[in-house]
Each structure stands twice: as structure tokens, then as C-alpha cells.
Amino acid sequence: MKTLSAKPAEVTHDWYVVDADGKTLGRLATQIATRLRGKHKPSFTPHVDTGDFIVVINADKITVTGKKAQDKKYYRHSGYPGGIKETNFSKLLAHKPEDVLHKAVKGMLPKGPLGYAMIKKLKLYAGTEHPHEAQQPKALDI
């Protein structure tokens, strides 16, 4: 018996919706990264994008434990000398709530063309509304 190797044309991508209300950042991000990569499927193949589409609602209500709301730092650079900017979790959550979960999940995915294709299947929304009702996403309890 041979090992199954998934072909890109044969892979089906399902749609799931996840409610992030009250969920812990890291625990939710690991589950989402696993689903985006496709490691939960028996037909997982490392060099093929076998993952599903994930729609996350209520991204503005995600939590962290301890004092990480003030202590967790996020950095970005403008490209100019001395252009490094720093913000903490609570400020980033107030300003751009989708970026918190996006950065956490992106760091858990492989780097390169396949990883970039996987992160595009993650759809993040701060509120309860999302424009993906036509895809009939299934509720995923994490």
C-alpha cells in the first residue's frame, strides 16, 4: 500500500467560522494554524495546501493571561534609520484588533510561497458580521 500524496486539484477547502470571544490568543492561534495548514486531515501533504478557510469573528474580544496586555510588545519598522515603532497588546487590540491574531497565526505558519497562500485563507473581523455567508461556513468550536 502506498502513502497517499494529495494533488492540488483534488483538495477540497471547507469554510469554518470561529468565535474568538473570550478565547486566549495563543491557544486559539495554534488551532487556527493547524486548520489552515491542513494537519487535521488524513490527506495532509507537506508540499500541498490542504488547509481550510477560517473566518474569525469577534477578534476584538480576544484575551491574554497575566500582565501580557501591558507587557507584550509588537514592533514594526518604517525602513528609515531610527524608524522602529513599538506598541503593546492592549493598544494594538484597540487600534487594529485583527492584527493581533493575524500576527500570532502568521508566525506559526511556514515561511515561503506556501505559507503566504495559507495566511490568505484566514479572514478576520472585529465584529460579529462577515461577508462570507455565501460560502456557508460551518461553526467550529475551539
Curated annotation (Swiss-Prot):
**What molecular functions are annotated in GO for this chain?**
mRNA binding; structural constituent of ribosome
What Pfam families does the database record attribute to this sequence? Ribosomal_L13
CDD domains membership: Ribosomal_L13
Gene Ontology terms, cellular component aspect? Answer: cytosolic large ribosomal subunit
Subunit structure, briefly?
Part of the 50S ribosomal subunit.
What the entry lists under PANTHER family is as follows: LARGE RIBOSOMAL SUBUNIT PROTEIN UL13M (PTHR11545:SF2), RIBOSOMAL PROTEIN L13 (PTHR11545)
Which protein, by its recorded name, is this?
Large ribosomal subunit protein uL13
What taxonomic ancestry is recorded?
Answer: Bacteria, Pseudomonadati, Pseudomonadota, Gammaproteobacteria, Moraxellales
Gene assigned in the entry: rplM
